[in-house]
């Protein structure tokens, strides 16, 4: 038992190292975390049911021995089945008889695994782009979060906490901005906005894949429609959706003849598929809508910098500022990427640590501005204006 717990802890530690990332906004968490976990776990459980137990059981003639029974079950599971209501006669023509074919259940675990991978791609792209920008945002968020966790209970005095932030996290963030600026960190906000656009597009694509997997000739919005059928008592025997009892045709070869046999099969997987697909239909709609709203929100923020500036001003208004530079000078020192970093700090850490970080960064801003590493051709006039104030 101890070895099993140790193995689980080791796996969790490995996952946490591989997927180090800020918490992100709601849409990001829904896409890259919650939905990925839902789809991955569903895929694993459903795939295991293909190999453990009997996903399909067919009613074979009495003269079939155990080998024939096993063959029929395996054949019908792999080849596919079709649905005909039990109160209707089977048509003689194969095309007419198999009109309502059931072909999805073999592929559902693999489709879910693919969807889980696709839902993580926007986060992967964002991590790749932020790595290209030269600034490790995840490490910065983690550093400030750890510092706040270690120091918030040591002293509850505002000035003491603020001094602690001025000594470590603020310098750390300013140094990160300085070093990244010397590389190519000019587009972090644009990169993040592009990742939210891809999240929204990807969510709708995944919703389309789900609807195509269970293409219904009766319903356009089959999620609410099938749920309505269940609430009204119209089960699979009436609608044909997720049927539990299906038909399967196979040929028995004999010398000089081929005999067609039709058997009834119990498709127990559809009991779970029905509930799971109804849940996923509504869930993916929810994720797609949230992702779309989030996408437009970040496009607006990209075009309008006042949101991040307003958040910072709100934090600065909560305490007296030691620095003599103006708000506009502070925003100019931060730059577009600095404003984005501060916005991400507020988003991931919450208002209290973000306010301490903002105020302390403002207090030591002039030291950063006057450092030789900060001065470049773009900012020399600005530095001169700071020194003359």
Swiss-Prot record:
Keyword field: Cell junction, Cell membrane, Gap junction, Ion channel, Ion transport, Membrane, Transmembrane, Transmembrane helix, Transport
Signal peptide from the UniProt entry: none
Membrane topology according to the record: Multi-pass membrane protein
Entry GO terms, CC: gap junction; plasma membrane
Origin superkingdom: Eukaryota
Cellular compartment(s): Cell membrane; Cell junction, Gap junction
Transmembrane regions: 36-56, 111-131, 190-210, 276-296
Any one GO MF annotation of this record: gap junction channel activity
GO biological process: monoatomic ion transmembrane transport
Pfam hit, one: Innexin
PANTHER family in the record: INNEXIN, INNEXIN-6
Record family assignment: Belongs to the pannexin family.
Role according to the record: Structural component of the gap junctions.
Record-given protein name: Innexin-6
Organism expressing this protein natively: Caenorhabditis elegans
Gene responsible for this protein: inx-6
